[in-house]
């Protein structure tokens, strides 16, 4: 890595604060042009004036409320890229790539095919061969986007609206994979490095799974809970058609049960009534599952880079979309979340910790213990706090205490997980970092930010009945994790970190890891931060657009 002597964030700070040295202790205010210094806000005002006149209703006006632009309205460098973007373009409503990433997760369901094949062979006496599987896959790729296969006089969906919808298949059996239609095969041997491919095939075995991508427009109109139902209905119709079955016979009920329940793997679990969301919604996605969705680990062997990509993507899902909109509703959470994936600040802290660990312990080179947790968490936390003290522009970049606390603790947690190969040790280091940080600065963030951090030490190195679970299986709905921004994305990175250090093929679920090794997805899950940048630069083309069915101009 060899990044110890180079502050990764300095280049971004020098460009953001032109004319000011990052070390300068004094600065100026009210001389930057207010909101007009921002190209994007000037565009907002221009649009808003026209629309206010057209609507006859007051609209966006940046002169209302606190004066904007007292200091520089900073551009942000997307970490790990050369792209500088305006902060407004990182709000998920303004960023098509973030929207598509969330949609791609919500619209995905994995369904095992072995139960259905057993019903065909044992109950109905129908032979299942690679040829019949290929015919079924062709049928489901007609039916899943909204094509009719069993009944006449059924309305169908325009293919141009759902060109993002398809089904693919994968298996751990190389002989079967060789005979399957390559157009719809996720080839584990091709998509993963050899050692990872062997690990995945060992866990998957001879079983066969299909990955269904329901149309983006469906999860836009409905929700993630719709996905398994949409999928199951078309699976049933496709089996009936491909294997020439009678739609009314009793065995069809077994297909329905398998497709809707028994063989279904969803991305997220259903949430309790007070959070009131169905399966496949962001609040039900465990941290380890999200880490498996991100694909950097199959194209990079750098544990720090892998963990940072997970954190960056998770920041948009958990903090911006889930907590910032589903649970809170507003615009402010983007500012918290983007601290983890902009200006190479977290990158600098994580690489510092990774190098410290590699030199002293080696990756996965020491058993987890409180002594190890204390050593690494203290070293990385103090390093991070020293940077904020040495570079005032860094402090201004992360102007909120909760931003600083999240970034420093994330580096401490990931670094400890790199050393121990243990995510629970990593999350314990996160909590120790928060305590050290509060001791040094007297506060962390907004009132309630550190609620979970004050009680986290007791439930991260022990498994208790009401606060159990290894860290990879925890998620946004875990006790105490439900409503504090600046935690969940970093927790996902800490779930990934030990597995990245060990070179594991997956974190929690090999099926989910394989399902997203799919080059036909519009969002590139290998490099999510690059995709977020493309969205901010308006270079990303999303799926699910309605151009075909609306007037040329509204």
Swiss-Prot record:
This is Methyl-coenzyme M reductase II subunit alpha. GO terms for biological process: methanogenesis. Disulfide bonds: none annotated. Coenzyme B binds at residues 229, 260-261, 274. Its cofactor is coenzyme F430. Gene3D superfamilies: 3.30.70.470, Methyl-coenzyme M reductase, alpha/beta subunit, C-terminal, Methyl-coenzyme M Reductase, Chain A, domain 1. The keyword Lipoprotein does not apply. Coenzyme F430 binds at residue 151. Its EC number is 2.8.4.1. Component of the methyl-coenzyme M reductase (MCR) I that catalyzes the reductive cleavage of methyl-coenzyme M (CoM-S-CH3 or 2-(methylthio)ethanesulfonate) using coenzyme B (CoB or 7-mercaptoheptanoylthreonine phosphate) as reductant which results in the production of methane and the mixed heterodisulfide of CoB and CoM (CoM-S-S-CoB). This is the final step in methanogenesis. The gene is mrtA. Pathway: One-carbon metabolism; methyl-coenzyme M reduction; methane from methyl-coenzyme M: step 1/1. Belongs to the methyl-coenzyme M reductase alpha subunit family. Keywords: Metal-binding, Methanogenesis, Methylation, Nickel, Transferase. Coenzyme M binds at residues 336, 447. The keyword Transmembrane helix does not apply. InterPro entries: Me_CoM_Rdtase_asu, Me_CoM_Rdtase_asu/bsu_C, Me_CoM_Rdtase_asu_C, Me_CoM_Rdtase_asu_N, Me_CoM_Rdtase_asu_N_sub1, Me_CoM_Rdtase_asu_N_sub2, Me_CoM_Rdtase_Fd-like_fold. MCR is a hexamer of two alpha, two beta, and two gamma chains, forming a dimer of heterotrimers. Binds 2 coenzyme F430 non-covalently per MCR complex. Coenzyme F430 is a yellow nickel porphinoid. Methyl-coenzyme-M reductase is activated when the enzyme-bound coenzyme F430 is reduced to the Ni(I) oxidation state. It catalyses: coenzyme B + methyl-coenzyme M = methane + coenzyme M-coenzyme B heterodisulfide. It comes from the Archaea. One of its GO terms (molecular function) is metal ion binding.
């Amino acid at each position: 890595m060899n990044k110890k002597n180079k502050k990764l964030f300095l280049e971004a700070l020098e460009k953001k604060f032109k004319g000011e040295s990052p070390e300068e202790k004094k600065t100026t205010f009210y001389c930057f042009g207010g909101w007009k210094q921002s190209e994007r806000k000037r565009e907002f005002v221009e649009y808003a004036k026209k629309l206010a006149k057209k609507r006859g209703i007051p609209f966006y006006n940046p002169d209302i409320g606190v004066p904007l632009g007292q200091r520089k309205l900073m551009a942000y460098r997307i970490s790990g890229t050369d792209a500088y973007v305006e902060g407004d373009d990182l709000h998920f409503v303004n960023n098509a790539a973030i929207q598509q990433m969330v949609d791609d997760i919500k619209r995905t369901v994995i369904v095992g095919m072995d139960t259905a094949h057993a019903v065909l062979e044992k109950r109905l006496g129908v032979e299942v061969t690679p040829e019949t599987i290929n015919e079924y896959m062709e049928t489901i790729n007609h039916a899943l986007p909204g094509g009719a296969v069993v009944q006449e006089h059924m309305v169908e969906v325009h293919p141009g609206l759902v060109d993002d919808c398809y089904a693919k298949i994968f298996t751990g059996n190389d002989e079967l994979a060789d005979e399957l239609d390559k157009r719809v095969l996720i080839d584990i041997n091709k998509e993963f490095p050899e050692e990872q491919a062997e690990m995945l095939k060992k866990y998957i075995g001879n079983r066969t799974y299909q990955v269904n991508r329901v149309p983006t427009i469906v999860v836009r109109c409905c929700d993630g809970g719709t996905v398994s139902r949409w999928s199951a209905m078309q699976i049933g119709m496709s089996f009936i058609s491909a294997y020439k079955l009678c739609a009314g016979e009793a065995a069809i009920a077994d297909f329905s049960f398998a497709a809707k329940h028994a063989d279904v793997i969803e991305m997220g679990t259903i949430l309790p009534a007070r959070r009131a969301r169905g399966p496949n919604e962001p609040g039900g996605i465990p941290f380890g599952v999200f880490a498996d969705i991100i694909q950097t680990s199959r194209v990079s062997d750098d544990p720090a880079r892998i963990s940072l990509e997970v954190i960056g993507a998770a920041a948009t899902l958990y903090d911006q979309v889930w907590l910032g909109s589903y649970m809170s509703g507003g615009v402010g959470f983007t500012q918290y979340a983007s601290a983890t994936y902009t200006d190479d600040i977290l990158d600098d802290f994580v690489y510092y910790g990774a190098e410290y660990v590699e030199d002293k312990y080696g990756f996965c080179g020491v058993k987890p213990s409180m002594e190890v947790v204390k050593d690494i968490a203290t070293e990385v936390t103090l390093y991070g706090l020293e940077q904020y003290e040495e570079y005032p522009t860094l402090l201004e970049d992360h102007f909120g205490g909760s931003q600083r606390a999240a970034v420093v603790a994330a580096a401490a947690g990931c670094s400890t997980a790199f050393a121990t190969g243990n995510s629970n040790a990593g999350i314990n280091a996160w909590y120790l970092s928060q305590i050290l940080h509060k001791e040094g600065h007297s506060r962390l963030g907004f009132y309630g930010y550190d609620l979970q951090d004050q009680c986290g030490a007791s439930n991260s190195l022990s498994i208790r009945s009401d606060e159990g679970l290894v860290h990879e299986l925890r998620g946004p709905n875990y006790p105490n994790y439900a409503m504090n921004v600046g935690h969940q994305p970093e927790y996902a990175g800490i779930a990934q970190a030990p597995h990245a250090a060990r070179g594991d093929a997956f974190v929690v679920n090999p099926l989910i890891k394989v399902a997203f090794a799919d080059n036909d997805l519009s969002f590139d899950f290998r490099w999510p931060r690059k995709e977020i940048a493309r969205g901010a630069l308006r270079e990303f083309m999303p799926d699910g657009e309605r151009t075909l069915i609306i007037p040329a101009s509204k």
